[in-house]
């Protein structure tokens, strides 16, 4: 049955981790990236800053662990859509709309993630390293769901092969993140309309022929 002391230690670690994540969610979600300190999060969670850093190596990693559960369902849905053989245009349309809704619903937290990812990118000056457990871009692979679906459609010949799935998914996600910061009053539907027009304009231009606004925001 295991060592009771070891079980108690694991339980304590799990509770501490949960308390830190809850405190971080509240802090980043209300104060954003720049005005939130790990020390303040630790105090709210009832632990020392050293304990917080034992669980999360950097402020960037802590924020990423808070934000990842918001984004992970998109990747789950993309994999399910591919496994079910769902039409890729439908899957991509729903994926883009869902991404825009999630970002709008969690606007301050999304802005904090964008700030953290940008700061880390500038710091290391390189693409994400899968082995870097402090890189928010690795811990929250925001582009992966779109990249999977676009790549799937391109491999099946349903979408044009250029731009590549990686390049286009990155462009789309960066656009969402930037507009989330620069246009805080913009609705998710408006953002999604823009992204869908750009995406299908590149991958399925025939979808746009004869329509001034083929993906109206009112949908």
Q: Language-model segments: which ranges?
A:
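Generic hydrophobic, amphipathic alpha-helix propensity
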Residues: 13-25, 41, 66-70, 74, ...
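Short secondary-structure transition hinges
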Residues: 100-147, 181
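Helix-loop "lid/cap" segments that line or gate small-molecule binding pockets
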Residues: 80-81, 97-104, 115-121, 196-203
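C-terminal peripheral helix-coil segments that are non-catalytic and often amphipathic
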Residues: 1-4, 101, 140-156, 162, ...
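Helix-turn-helix
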Residues: 19, 27-61, 65
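Hydrophobic alpha-helical connector segments
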Residues: 65, 79-106, 169
């Amino acid at each position: 049955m295991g060592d009771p002391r070891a079980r108690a230690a694991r339980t304590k670690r799990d509770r501490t981790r949960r308390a830190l994540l809850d405190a971080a969610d509240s802090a980043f979600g209300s104060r954003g990236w720049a005005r939130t300190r790990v020390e303040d999060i630790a105090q709210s969670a009832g632990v020392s800053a050293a304990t917080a850093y034992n669980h999360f190596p950097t402020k960037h990693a802590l924020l990423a662990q808070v934000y990842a559960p918001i984004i992970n369902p998109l990747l789950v849905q993309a994999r399910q859509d591919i496994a079910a053989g769902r039409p890729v245009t439908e899957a991509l349309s729903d994926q883009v709309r869902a991404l825009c809704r999630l970002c709008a619903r969690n606007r301050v937290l999304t802005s904090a993630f964008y700030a953290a990812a940008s700061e880390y990118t500038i710091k290391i000056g390189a693409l994400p390293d899968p082995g870097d457990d402090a890189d928010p871009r690795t811990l929250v692979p925001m582009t992966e769901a779109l990249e999977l679906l676009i790549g799937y459609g391109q491999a099946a010949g349903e979408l044009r092969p250029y731009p590549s799935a990686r390049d286009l998914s990155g462009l789309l996600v960066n656009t969402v993140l930037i507009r989330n910061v620069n246009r805080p009053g913009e609705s998710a539907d408006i953002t999604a309309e823009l992204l869908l027009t750009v995406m299908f304009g590149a991958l399925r231009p025939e979808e746009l022929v004869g329509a001034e606004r083929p993906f109206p925001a009112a949908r």
